[in-house]
Amino acid sequence: TLIEATGSQTHLEALRRRAAAQGLRIADGRLWSGGDALAVADELQLYAALGCQWVPPELREDGAELEAAAHRRLPTLVEPGDLRGALHNHTTDSDGTASVEAMARAAAELGWKFVGIADHSPAAHYANGLSADRLAAQWRVIDGLNARGGPRLVKGIEADILPDGRLDLPAGCEVGLEYVVASVHSSFRMAAEAQTERILAAVRHPACRVLGHPTGRLLLARPGYELDL
C-alpha cells in the first residue's frame, strides 16, 4: 500500500511501534487487532486510529514527527496555491519544451507574480546553451512581454560551475542580468573537499541567487557528487 511504500523505513517502523503499544499491528496494508482487520479506509483513518494527525509523505522521516502528530503540532506545508513564482526554468531557447511567451502565459494562468527565465549557459553545448547574442535576443523578447503587464519575467541564466569554481557567463551579460542559477554539470568525480570549494566559489559570485540541483543525484540513475553540505 502507499503508506508502506512512501516515506522512510524509519517512519514506518515508528508507526508500527506505536500500533504495537496499543495492541495493534500494521501488516499487508491493513491495521489489525489480533486476527481481525479493522475498518480503516484510508491513511487519514489509520493515523487517527493510532491517535495521530495525518502525516504527509514529505514529513515521514525519522519517526519524531509522530510525536508532533500525536499533539497536533505538525507544520503547515506549502501548497501550490501559495507559490508566487519560480526561478529555475528553461525554455525552447535551450533545452526546455515551452517558449518564453508560453511560460509567461502559464505563469499568468497559475496566478504567479513572477517567473524566472534561466536557460543554459554556453558551456552546456549538449543543452543548446545560449551565447551572448542569443541571450540578448531573449532579453528583448522578455522586455516586450514585460511591457504588456502580467507576471514579471525575470532575466536569468543557469550558469555551469566550471571545475575551478568560475561561472560560465556569456560575455557582457552582467548588464541586465538579474540572477544566476549556478549548477554543476561536469567533473562529478572531484574529491569532496575540492568539490565543496568549487561550489562555494561559485555561490560567492554576486549574481548567484540559486544553487541548482545541489547534490547532482539522479534518483535511481546517478549517485550525487561528493561534497560537504
Regions found by a protein language model. Give the residues of each.
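An N-terminally biased module of ancient metal coordination in phosphate/nucleic-acid-related enzymes
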Residues: 65-162, 187-189, 193, 210, ...
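Short, electropositive alpha-helical surface patch
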Residues: 136-139, 166-181
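Acidic (Asp/Glu)-rich catalytic clusters
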Residues: 108-109, 169-177, 201-207
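Short acidic, glycine/serine/threonine-rich loops at helix termini
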Residues: 3, 127-129, 165-168
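Acidic, metal-coordinating catalytic segment for phosphate/diphosphate chemistry
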Residues: 1-79
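Hydrophobic/basic alpha-helical segments enriched in Actinobacteria
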Residues: 31-32, 37-38, 172-176, 188-189, ...
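Distinct, well-ordered alpha-helical segments
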Residues: 163-173, 199-200, 222-227
